[in-house]
Amino acid sequence: MTATRHPFASDIDAATRIAEPDFDLLDALVRTDDPDDQAHTLARVVLAAFDNYYAVSRRIPALAQAAFEARDWAATVRLSKIRLGLYTACIDQLVPLLKAGLPELANDEQLWARAEAELLAAIAERYEADFAFAFWQSLRRKLVSDEWRPVSYDTGPAARPKATSAAILKTIATTLPIRPAVIRDILDGAGLRGPWRDRDGDAALAAAAIEAALEPLGPRAGETAKIEIAESGFFRNRGACLVGRVRLRDRGDMPMRNLPLLIALLNEDDGLVVDAVLCDADELQYAFSSTLANYHATNPHYHELARLLHELMPKRPLGTQYSCIGFHHLGKVAVMTEILAEHRRSKEKLDTAPGFKGTVAIAFTMPSSAYVLKIIRDHPTDDYKFDYFDGLDAVLRKYNLVHEIDRAGSMLDNIIYSNVKLERTMFAPDLLDELLESGIDTVTLERGALVFRHLIVQIKLTPLPLYLTTASAADARAAVINLGDCIKNNAAADIFNKDLDGRNYGVSRIRKVYLFDYDAVEPLTDVRVRGDDAPPGPEFEDGVVFRPADMLGGLRIDDPALRRAFRDAHPELMQPEYWQGMQRALRAGKVPRVMNYPAARRLRR
């Protein structure tokens, strides 16, 4: 399918170009000897760099909407990559200039303190004051190579009032049953340019789907209701969605009832369509999962958006809600703050994560924590399957690669911290010993604390083989079938896990299967896929060689019934033609479709 080109496509470079630093300000900073003047100018230099970053980042959601309207799928992928790299690029542009002009700057604590006060005064009335302060902290840490600290943006000089979701919601009063005309008004309110295939028909189907989802809440005909819809479009790859909730008022026999709502939109050759309606918190959580590419939200009020998403998906920590709409640094701070709060609240020790001992990574967690932390070993264990280990930095690059791509709904995102310090008392003794013995290049003990050169944090999963030992027959069958979907989605993202071992996959709280270990991932387009007539083993060829016929044996699915369920659901995965066809599509620059919600929620036409 050839997408229509939108006039904006050739202007993406111009719209997302990072402006040059203000060299007049930089010159003034270098020339002045007055401490107060120097502090004031340094604050202005950094704030100008932040303003440049923030202005470009706020243009991207509108460009993503335009790309969706134009069906320019290559542009949507490009915009996601640009946005992911923008924050670091703006900091990296300024740091060498400051180092060259003021080499003593990194160690001048008094100057930094005065400049920080100037910056905080300048941003005091701005909505994005916390984000500007985060940028300041990131830049200083890059200059000084200092310890990473979770700076609190909810309290202190850059604080802002606590966000409430009501500020970004449009409320539509209605009565039950919900009429198609109400849904049509919501679709019209999205402001999407382009024809609809059948807007009235879609509105009727969506209204019926919402009515069916309301049934367990005991609705009554004529009962008043409110539909609250976020005044924001959410755009990602080939799709878009509208997000909100249906609220039924408290009545004598029933308390206030809330139903999450996501209306998923596609733009097909023959027009815009409502593809699915989701009204379950777990299903919304999957659609907004950090295992997918980030959404571009057209509403700039990121705190209110994150709060709304947390209200709709309360099982997911607030920190990850920021990340899924692209505010990774705020999400990074929120996640570490949550981990430290979990420890203070539970008094639990960090200890080896349940499951199988990693050959490349050491994974650890607290029993009640929502997160798993891991480091990369200096050297793999004796059980390592491959002849050659590329080393710690190469493995970290693979984790970063997964962070920077569309994870296709089947790979966990990673937060990678540098130079982070955790108190020694947080760790169980055996784990502490292993970290210090097997992570010499990564972990050091300094004055009662462990300092991590790198620390990877992911959402906690149950390793698939462990899950299968305790799951019901139905849940186990669903998991192995979902494993096949996971492998297909990874392939659609040009990711191949050459260690197709079930221990590298895990099951989430909402019973979805994800890949979570990335030391063995390779671009699928670089893999040599071979059939039965190929040489008998990879030792005959250079590079990564994959024989699909051998796949099932490596997955460690021991139960014959589960092996049969996997094979029956995904026979194409054992055929080289499937993999070679996916490689051809990826090399041609096509953006394969990825299912971000259950097929059962798609509207039946």
UniProtKB/Swiss-Prot annotation:
Positions annotated to bind ATP: A353, P354, G355, F356, K357, G358, T359, K374
Swiss-Prot/TrEMBL keywords: ATP-binding, Cytoplasm, Glyoxylate bypass, Hydrolase, Kinase, Nucleotide-binding, Protein phosphatase, Serine/threonine-protein kinase, Transferase, Tricarboxylic acid cycle
Molecular functions (GO terms): [isocitrate dehydrogenase (NADP+)] kinase activity; AMP binding; ATP binding; phosphoprotein phosphatase activity; protein serine/threonine kinase activity
InterPro entries in alphabetical order: AceK_kinase (IPR046855), AceK_regulatory (IPR046854), Isocitrate_DH_AceK (IPR010452)
Active site residues of this protein: D413
One GO CC term, this protein: cytoplasm
GO biological process, one term: glucose metabolic process
Domain of life: Bacteria
Catalyzed chemical reaction(s): L-seryl-[isocitrate dehydrogenase] + ATP = O-phospho-L-seryl-[isocitrate dehydrogenase] + ADP + H(+)
Cellular localisation: Cytoplasm
Pfam families linked to this entry: AceK_kinase, AceK_regulatory
EC number in record: 2.7.11.5, 3.1.3.-
Function: Bifunctional enzyme which can phosphorylate or dephosphorylate isocitrate dehydrogenase (IDH) on a specific serine residue. This is a regulatory mechanism which enables bacteria to bypass the Krebs cycle via the glyoxylate shunt in response to the source of carbon. When bacteria are grown on glucose, IDH is fully active and unphosphorylated, but when grown on acetate or ethanol, the activity of IDH declines drastically concomitant with its phosphorylation.
Family: Belongs to the AceK family.
The protein's name: Isocitrate dehydrogenase kinase/phosphatase
Species: Rhodopseudomonas palustris (strain HaA2)
